Amino acid sequence: EFREWMDEKITLTQVLIHKKQLQADISLQITIPNEFEKICKTNIGYTAGIETNKVAPIWLQKGNDMDKILVVSNHAKTTYENTTTMATNNQTGEQVKYKLQTPIHVVHECTVRSEPEPIENFDLTTDFNFLTISQFSPRKNFHNTIKWWIEEFIDQNVGLIVKTNLANNSQMDWFASNNMLKQILEEYPDRKCKIYLLHGDLSSGQMTWLYNNDKIKSLINISHGEGFGLPMFEAAREGLPIITVGWSGQTDFLHYNGKKYFEDVKFNLQQVQKEAVWDGVIQQDSGWAFADQGSYKMALRKTYKNHDKSLKRASKLKTLLNENFNEQKLYDGFVEQIVPLQEMKKIDAEIDDLLSDLL
């Protein structure tokens, strides 16, 4: 009921603002920068979707309409700040370099940790399993994630849990996801390794259970780029070893004081594939990471053969994350960017004065 009430009030507020019947003091716009608007006295844009090494020109224009921009990783911040395009000076007709001028700050993502909650009727018959969590999409490099994993463990009694979907968690989506997975598996009819498809909505507690399951030994992710990499963060927070490329958003929480706390997969930066281009979001002339097949397989093998070492490193990372990326610290950092502490104290003092006058 509270959620419905809140959604109703948000919708009403948006309508009143666009009709110019309400002038809010501040707007926080959580969306892709294409949709940033100057609708209040102070406008803050908040976006997570920067997975390449260049943003679209429209993002620079829309970003400069904001008073502040918040992003979820240093990769996103650096990419946004370093992107330039050519624009025409309306007064002189001269071609000039155009870039973001708006201040941009990093506020890392976080989710509330829930206690483990078992997933009913989900039984693993293999004792050593890897986990991957992604959509079936070009950016996630899912086909190679699965194909190369099978080739590495084709004659081993090892499992891979594939938590995925194509677009949503409907029954039709399950059939489509299952068929796509079958197409990959048909190439390896004699494999001994096992693939488990996990589809549909899972609660936060069920995700925590996955990360802590005794039979799940590592999370793998060789996507081309991540704005932050929330599943990797959640898994690392629980002490699950991570296998990934050392590029894009996940490096913020997988590195500490120059040290890597994950199994590093080598990669090359190359132009994005044609099928991944999304005009105004993923630029055709931008690039992202392409994991090296041999390095990925070696990382899988090292984790399988030396799991105790991987677990020890993951345990150290868990401690670091609980100290430096805990929920309260990330929440405080986010609030500070919306309403700075000194301004909050000033508002509190004004409210206290008002209440004292009333009393």
Regions from the PLM with identified roles:
Residues K215-K217, G239:
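A short alpha->beta transition loop at the rim of the catalytic pocket in nucleotide-sugar-dependent
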Residues P241-T244, K260-D264:
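Short hydrophobic beta-strand element within catalytic cores of glycosyltransferases
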Residues K68-P116, K266:
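Donor nucleotide-sugar binding/catalytic pocket of nucleotide-sugar-dependent glycosyltransferases
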Residues L166, N268-L359:
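C-terminal amphipathic helix plus adjacent low-complexity
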Residues H224:
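Aromatic "clamp/platform" in nucleotide-sugar-dependent glycosyltransferases that forms part
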Residues F122-K140, I146-I150, L160-V162:
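Conserved donor-binding/catalytic core segment of Leloir-type glycosyltransferases
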Residues F2-Y80:
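Extended catalytic core of nucleotide-activated donor transferases of GT-like folds
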Residues Q171-L210, K217-S218:
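Nucleotide-activated donor-binding/catalytic signature segment of Leloir-type glycosyltransferases, i.e.
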